[in-house]
Amino acid sequence: QRTDHWVMDKKHAPYLFFVGVGEYAVIKDKWKNIAVDYYVEKEYEPYAKQIFGMTPEMLEFFSKQLKYEYPWQKYAQIVGRDFVSGAMENTTAVIHHEAVQQKAGQLIDENKWEETIAHELFHHWFGDLVTAESWSNLTVNESFATYSQYLWNEYKYGKDEADYKLWSSLRGYFSDPANISRDLVRFNYHAREDMFDGVSYNKGGGILHMLRNYLGDEAFFTGLSDYLKTNEYGTGEAHQLRLSLEKVSGKDLNWFFNQWFFGSGHPKLDIKYT
């Protein structure tokens, strides 16, 4: 018999609690003094570092970019068979769909799961440290995690690659014609699952990119840091994000949030070549 003791002494949302049990190989990594562990099926043990090995670099990059060091006591990633979605940002214990497991022949071209790894890690600031006050404001979780994929690609592979991936993401939003009528912040929906769509993720990430370009990097990232520090270990919503960005930038952003967070639609361009 064996007894394991687990402690989480920092506040986080109940839906982010997770325990995983199984026959796993555990590959130990670290970032600074924080344990970074990868739980994979034993067949994939030789490839775990190739799959997850950029995690410490991501921790360093996101901590610096947000001017807020990773706030939790450890970071683990585990694989789950037949998981209902791609991954889930359980606090300090992310679960990934089995598709994350790849072998050398697949990884030689690219790690197809790299953006998802970045996405779930970024949630530990936007989603776990500060959690959406309700599903209506899911944007402060998922739009940010989606945009983290752009940030990581821009840092690691350059702006052209990041822009290409952003365009691919926005095509996901455009693929559903009904998305044009859906606000980013929605106070009316049939079921909470309705909020997990191309608006909350894909379009929301694009809106954050637009906001970043409007404010400039210094104001944008300092504003995000202020939002995290102001609302840490609690809940957040779009107006609190606006207030932090206004505080740092000195700009009135009501017009932007009214149009892009509390409204629907997208620009329609008529492009002519000569």
Q: What label would you give each PLM region?
A:
Residues 6, 35-274:
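Hydrophobic alpha-helical and helix-loop surface patches within well-folded domains
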Residues 1, 26, 271-274:
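Short amphipathic beta-strand and strand-loop transition segments with alternating hydrophobic
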